[in-house]
Amino acid sequence: MGPEPAGATVRPTFAKSALIRSKIEGIDYAVNPYYGCLHGCRYCYAAWMTRRRFPDHVWGLHVHPKVNVHRLLDRELSSARPGLLGIGTSTDPYQSIESRFQLTRRCLEVISHHPGFDVSLLTKSPLVLRDLEVLRAIDAEVGFSVSGLGDAVRLLEPRAPPGEARLAALRRLSSEGLRTFAFISPVLPGVTDRQIRTLLRAVAEARPSKVLVDALRFRPGVLQSMRSALSSSPDLLRELGSYASDQAWWLQRARAEMEEAAAGLGLSLEFLF
């Protein structure tokens, strides 16, 4: 949640629009206050989307704050048909530089003046707690994505806050009465499947309103990026190769193990694969 990592390039920019029609089922509009994300997660599907706009950028080391996004949002919501706003569909709205630019907060404040729009926000950062009161005021739903706990996941999430910190923040928001969800995504071979019971127990203790689970999907460049990140870990490379060679079998096995563990915890899981 602190300053941007060494070597990062932050270049403020002016966006042309704030609302984007979403292709995600159930979400009408996407709102992303930043181009790029400093978390640098090596499995992120948004990396290739950012590279299309900025071909020379290194994923995780370049970010463009959309410094006018809140003003655009105010204007566009005035004429948009009411619907669900998904905040953070291709960036983390609470990545470290949000503490400096406060663009996500400003967007939330704008939304509070436009009744009729629901909000579902996804993050990996406890910085979201800063905005608890405005999130409560607009009855926002807040989700945290988490694929694993401890050091096992760090090679693939080099600058994201630890999973334990995310779940602690999730528990705080749940205890404050906000609608919350845990998003176990992506299910990572050699990581998520090796700590299913531990992870699901920690998720259950955070008391989310719901728990979603999604698969690792190989968007353009993702497999290559993951292989590079895991080059120092032969075991994880082998697990990744096993998944890549037979995703259907691997996911069927992982789902069965997760369902069994969740049943023992009284936890209901909603699978998106």
Model regions: which residues?
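Conserved Radical SAM active-site core
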Residues: 1-141, 149-151, 167
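Surface-exposed amphipathic alpha-helices with a cationic face
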Residues: 112, 136, 170-175, 259, ...
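Auxiliary Fe-S-binding modules of radical SAM enzymes
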Residues: 1-14, 20-21, 194-273
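Conserved strand-turn element in the central/C-terminal portion of the radical SAM core barrel
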Residues: 159, 172-192
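Short, electropositive alpha-helical surface patch
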Residues: 101-102, 136-147, 192-209
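Active-site glycine- and acidic-residue-rich loops that bind
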Residues: 120-121, 187-197
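Conserved radical SAM core fold
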Residues: 51, 86-95, 126-129, 141-160, ...
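Hydrophobic faces of well-ordered beta-strands that scaffold small-molecule active sites
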Residues: 29, 85, 119-121, 142-144, ...
